Swiss-Prot record:
Residues 152-178 have a biased composition (Gly residues). The lineage of its organism: Eukaryota, Amoebozoa, Evosea, Eumycetozoa, Dictyostelia. Residues 580-607 form a coiled coil. The keyword Coiled coil applies. It comes from Dictyostelium discoideum (Social amoeba). This is Putative uncharacterized protein DDB_G0284097.
Length: 633
């Protein structure tokens, strides 16, 4: 009885015309091996054949009429045979090929081996099938040594062949055996190295990622690692097949994440790949002398403190709780306070800060400091004028160029001065590249290399009343040490030569053109409105640098817009001495902290509402030129 469609076949197997299940190669036995089958296997065959013999003969003619014209040689015996597949599962084989059973042992003498069975009559088919049934009953013990072929894809070469008369070893007159391509190919067609993924969160900055320009960061990672990078607004996704390269790429992104984006570009100077952040090349510093301003001298400051003490009980409680955490280490370490970022560092040495305080206290402290700047809407602002502070030092213009070494991953800072090139030596250059008559050519000179030991970046909102807008300040906390010549500076000779090769063309309108030879400069664009730098200096004071920076775009084709910026130093020797004495109370630290906060608040307000800052005159530049060698460490 034909069992077509009556049984489910194991997945992954190829079934000819959807009705047959094929055995493995040689039926699971090797060619030439003794024809021994399992006893249970033979008994099952014998019992099934005896029970179904009469039924086969009665329904033979009926089943023959139900066959498809393409398969006239198909056996109608309906014997149910089982074999052990190569996957360890029993598979049903109902109605195998009678004419194509491939027996070459001489017992099946009546098998038709002609490929032209399609033209035979039904009587011949019936006679052939009857003979095949009888022969199959006599050859039960030897049937499963046959190949999968048969006459459909069969071969007269024996049981080891899967090929056919069509000339293909795996073919057949009807397509024959297709192997197991549908099973194995689907399993391995998508194989390949698995990419490891690392996700780094990025704080938003100026409408974009704090990393800076996406193309520049991609170019850096592409040259330094084998990782792939995708930068979103607040997230950077790094993918790499190698775990070591992934860690290196993540370390680079984390270092850039904690760096304020001055100007970001990937440059190739003399064959070395570096990343550079360029500060504004023109700004001056105004240092507030200690004691020049008494925070308690004005009614506005006194009103500020009265409001804090009387109406902001929640602020006082949180601030006291924060300072109480300093007791555990005040006997062995000096607290380093970034007042604007709301972080407290413990300086075990002058250059290496310890781990900052926990995140929950950081949030409390940040919220508390915000109330210092704006506890109420009725505060009268007190703006600093020139009569309220003493200017005792003024430095000439210089440029900071911060560099990330992609080999050692060290952050370096290069301080350069701008020197005007005399027209007699650059007449040809100015004529060709700077047609404007009011243009002057400058270059960077006297570079000094500093190693940045710690960099931290954060943002603080200064609420403004008089100006009608808020001031967003980016705060960088870092310490740096100068690399003395002879102690490793020689490895940065190429960097120094590259800085010296940069030429700057300036005009009266403020549009500057930078010529950078022998480099691959990516398009860069970064916007910084304000930033505050705070670090511990050697003169025992905590210094706050309030810089006013304007956006600059660095490209190799278009002119660059560069404007002046301002820096203000606000020091607090009293707070530093208080911590250094290791004999302080929470109230004392809180009072000094409020004073310093108010001083910084007034300084920022002054610069917002003042007129455009005027650069120092030539007399001042000459007078204090010798002070440039005393750069803070």
């Amino acid at each position: 009885m034909n069992n077509r469609g009556g049984f489910s076949h194991p997945p992954g197997k190829f079934h000819m015309r959807g009705s047959k299940t094929y055995t493995p190669r040689n039926g699971g036995q090797g060619q030439g091996q003794p024809q021994q089958a399992a006893p249970a296997f033979d008994q099952q065959q014998q019992q099934q054949q005896q029970q179904q013999q009469q039924q086969q003969q009665q329904q033979q003619n009926f089943d023959q009429q139900q066959q498809q014209p393409q398969q006239p040689q198909q056996q109608q015996g309906g014997n149910n045979y089982y074999f052990q597949s190569k996957f360890g599962n029993k598979s049903h084989r109902g109605g195998y090929h009678g004419n194509g059973n491939g027996n070459n042992n001489g017992n099946n003498n009546n098998n038709n081996t002609s490929p032209n069975l399609n033209s035979t009559s039904h009587n011949n088919n019936n006679n052939n099938n009857n003979n095949n049934n009888n022969n199959n009953n006599n050859n039960n013990n030897t049937h499963f040594t046959n190949s999968r072929g048969g006459h459909r894809g069969g071969s007269s070469r024996g049981g080891s062949s899967r090929g056919g008369n069509s000339g293909s070893s795996r073919g057949g007159s009807r397509g024959g055996y297709r192997g197991q391509s549908s099973f194995y190919n689907s399993s391995y067609q998508k194989s390949g190295p698995r990419l490891l993924t690392s996700i780094v969160s990025l704080p938003p900055f100026s409408g974009g990622a704090i990393i800076g320009v996406k193309g520049s960061l991609w170019g850096l990672l592409n040259k330094a690692t084998t990782a792939r990078l995708k930068v979103f607004k607040n997230t950077a996704i790094i993918k790499c097949a190698d775990a070591q390269q992934l860690d290196r790429a993540k370390e680079i992104v984390l270092k850039l994440k904690n760096t304020s984006p001055k100007y970001l570009s990937l440059i190739d100077y003399k064959g070395e790949q570096k990343i550079k952040f360029v500060h504004q090349p023109s700004f001056s510093e105004v240092i507030l002398e200690s004691g020049a301003i008494d925070p308690l001298a004005t009614d506005g400051v006194q009103l500020m403190q009265d409001l804090i003490n009387s109406h902001e009980s929640q602020y006082v409680a949180r601030l006291n709780e924060t300072f109480s955490t300093l007791y555990s280490e005040k006997g062995s370490s000096t607290p380093f306070i970034d007042i604007e970022a709301g972080k407290i560092w413990y300086l075990h040495s002058s250059n290496i800060p310890s781990t900052p305080m926990t995140a929950d206290k950081y949030e409390l402290y940040t919220e508390s400091l915000a109330s210092v700047f704006q506890p109420s809407n009725v505060i009268n602002e007190q703006f600093i004028t020139s009569s309220q502070y003493k200017l005792f030092k003024q430095k000439k213009q210089f440029t900071f160029i911060s560099v990330l070494d992609t080999e050692s991953l060290d952050l370096l800072c290069i301080k350069c001065s701008e020197e005007k090139i005399t027209p007699t030596t650059t007449t040809t250059t100015n004529t060709q590249q700077s047609p404007n008559s009011d243009s002057s050519e400058y270059k960077f000179t006297d570079p000094f290399i500093y190693k940045l030991n710690h960099i931290n970046s954060s943002k603080v909102l200064f609420p403004q009343i008089k100006s009608g807008s808020d001031l967003r300040v980016t705060i960088d906390t870092h310490s740096k040490s100068k690399l003395v010549s002879g102690t490793g500076q020689h490895q940065y000779d190429n960097l120094i030569k590259f800085i010296d090769s940069i030429k700057i063309h300036k005009n009266s309108s403020g549009n500057n053109t930078y010529q950078i030879p022998d480099s691959n400069l990516f398009m860069t664009e970064s916007i910084i409105t304000r930033k505050v730098l705070m670090y511990r200096s050697d003169d025992n004071s905590l210094q706050f640098h309030v810089n006013e920076d304007i956006a600059t775009r660095y490209t190799t084709s278009t002119p660059e817009v560069n404007r002046e910026s301002t820096t203000v130093f606000c020091t607090s020797p009293a707070l530093y001495d208080l911590f250094k004495s290791k004999n302080w109370t929470v109230d004392q630290a809180s009072d000094e902290l409020k004073k310093l906060s108010k001083n910084l608040r007034l300084l920022v307000s002054k610069h917002l509402d003042s007129t455009k800052f005027q650069p120092p005159s030539a007399d001042h530049t000459t007078q204090f030129e010798q002070d440039d060698e005393e750069e803070e460490n």
